[in-house]
């Protein structure tokens, strides 16, 4: 029966020699496992056979109390589970004591949406050259359809149905969806198509760079940020913020969570619930209008 340090050293050699992990990854494993060694030693453990699920849970609680974030704790527990799995494979343990212990879910931080007045100011750009027309069209489509950045740059001309005012989008997991894009976006797309051949006509992409190639995601991010500054917006403008604003404004206006889910291309409704938020004033007005106990004087 070996001691705490010896087993960890053997495991790190296994990761280095047999798994051929990088020095940085090995160092991360070492740091995570040193933390559990220290905790186990403080609690009087002399070998890993004395470790049980209760001790692992106490270790997780203590780590959180000492300020370790949820994501970092998840990584620490993952390293610990892998180590114990290896001990089981070496017949040093009968079962993995960390198997049923999980870290709290990492909170998802939502980007701030752009309010409607600022959206209108952003879209009211001075059209003085073909690239500005292209950018206006991209902004209109991004906000008008709530696209992901990858979906915007992946658009081809053939994906447009100008008669119906719709666009075919290839989303995550190669899932295709058909979306309305609105009159304003449609008008600016047509305006851009009149100028597009100035940059080239061989590429199938809807939006081209000044070199005549499909515009890159990085270029879109850069141009949107520049327009945000030019238009005097206080918040940094990036594509995801436009998608988030689309979702928020649609939900505030319609209250149709399932409809917004379909428009965004979310596989699960829970994603839409996290992704969108209603401001308190809107929620209060919905409550006052709909809840039986809120209808005062009736």
UniProtKB/Swiss-Prot annotation:
Belongs to the 'phage' integrase family. XerC subfamily. FtsK may regulate the catalytic switch between XerC and XerD in the heterotetrameric complex during the two steps of the recombination process. Keywords: Cell cycle, Cell division, Chromosome partition, Cytoplasm, DNA integration, DNA recombination, DNA-binding. Residues 109-288 form the Tyr recombinase domain. Disulfide bonds: none annotated. Site-specific tyrosine recombinase, which acts by catalyzing the cutting and rejoining of the recombining DNA molecules. Binds cooperatively to specific DNA consensus sequences that are separated from XerD binding sites by a short central region, forming the heterotetrameric XerC-XerD complex that recombines DNA substrates. The complex is essential to convert dimers of the bacterial chromosome into monomers to permit their segregation at cell division. It also contributes to the segregational stability of plasmids. In the complex XerC specifically exchanges the top DNA strands. The lineage of its organism: Bacteria, Pseudomonadati, Pseudomonadota, Gammaproteobacteria, Enterobacterales. Residues 2-88 form the Core-binding (CB) domain. GO terms for molecular function: DNA binding; tyrosine-based site-specific recombinase activity. The keyword Lyase does not apply. CDD domains: INT_XerDC_C. The active site is at residues 148, 172, 240, 243, 266, 275. The keyword Magnesium does not apply. Pfam families: Phage_int_SAM_1 (PF02899), Phage_integrase (PF00589). One of its GO terms (biological process) is DNA transposition. It comes from the Bacteria. This is Tyrosine recombinase XerC. Forms a cyclic heterotetrameric complex composed of two molecules of XerC and two molecules of XerD, in which XerC interacts with XerD via its C-terminal region, XerD interacts with XerC via its C-terminal region and so on. It is found in: Cytoplasm.
